[in-house]
């Protein structure tokens, strides 16, 4: 399959974003998949245009976006995105939407149509912390996952799409001993395992839910 894997530019006054750093280190061929890579701006207003152009100019079977989730200790495939932008901080264009719908004609939520449980289990099988997430937040990461679901719903019915959040890397938490992190090498290993798990097979039926 032909997969577009995206990562984000740094934001919130940081100099690095592990999502893009990891994406750049992915192999161009992973299993049976051919990988293209795209760096997205951390910008509510710009990401839609970049994704639209990428899909218009290439035939991608799958778009998989990678984002930073500082404070998480595991690599977390996302199950669902919700139709709301509610930014705790401004994006890189100093734009801070509050309680705004992403697409007025969109569904309340869109679920990833990738095998998110198989992907999560594949990460865990590498001996790495992995967990299935049921919230992509309400910042640009959720926005991108929702926009991909919207595009699949309205324009690209065969498109498969998903999102994975990754932790900070150690360089980002200097002086913050209580903040979890993961080496870039392990993030790349985990993402590679998740991508290898993508197939046309049905997702695993295993208990990866949460009680809260």
UniProtKB/Swiss-Prot annotation:
One of its GO terms (biological process) is proteolysis. SUPFAM superfamilies: Pyrrolidone carboxyl peptidase (pyroglutamate aminopeptidase). It is found in: Cytoplasm. Its EC number is 3.4.19.3. GO terms for cellular component: cytosol. PANTHER family: PROTEASE FAMILY C15 PYROGLUTAMYL-PEPTIDASE I-RELATED, PYROGLUTAMYL-PEPTIDASE I. Homotetramer. This is Pyrrolidone-carboxylate peptidase. It comes from Staphylococcus aureus (strain bovine RF122 / ET3-1). The lineage of its organism: Bacteria, Bacillati, Bacillota, Bacilli, Bacillales.
């Amino acid at each position: 399959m032909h997969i577009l894997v995206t990562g984000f530019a740094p934001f919130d006054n940081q100099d690095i974003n592990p999502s893009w750093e990891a994406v750049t280190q992915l192999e161009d061929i992973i299993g049976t998949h051919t990988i293209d890579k795209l760096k997205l701006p951390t910008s509510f207003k710009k990401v839609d245009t970049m994704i639209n152009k990428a899909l218009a100019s290439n035939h991608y079977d799958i778009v998989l976006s990678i984002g930073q989730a500082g404070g998480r200790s595991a690599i977390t495939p996302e199950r669902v995105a919700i139709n709301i932008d509610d930014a705790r901080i401004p994006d890189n264009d100093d734009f801070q939407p509050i309680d705004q719908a992403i697409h007025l004609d969109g569904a309340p939520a869109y679920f990833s149509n990738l095998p998110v449980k198989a992907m999560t289990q594949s990460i865990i099988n590498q001996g790495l912390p992995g967990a299935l997430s049921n919230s992509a937040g309400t910042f640009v990461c959720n926005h991108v996952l929702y926009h991909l679901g919207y595009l699949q719903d309205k324009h690209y019915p065969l498109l498969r799409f998903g999102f994975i959040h990754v932790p900070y890397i150690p360089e980002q938490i200097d002086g913050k001993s209580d903040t979890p992190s993961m080496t870039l090498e392990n993030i790349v290993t985990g993402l590679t395992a998740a991508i290898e798990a993508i197939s046309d097979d049905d997702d695993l039926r295993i208990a990866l839910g949460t009680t809260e």
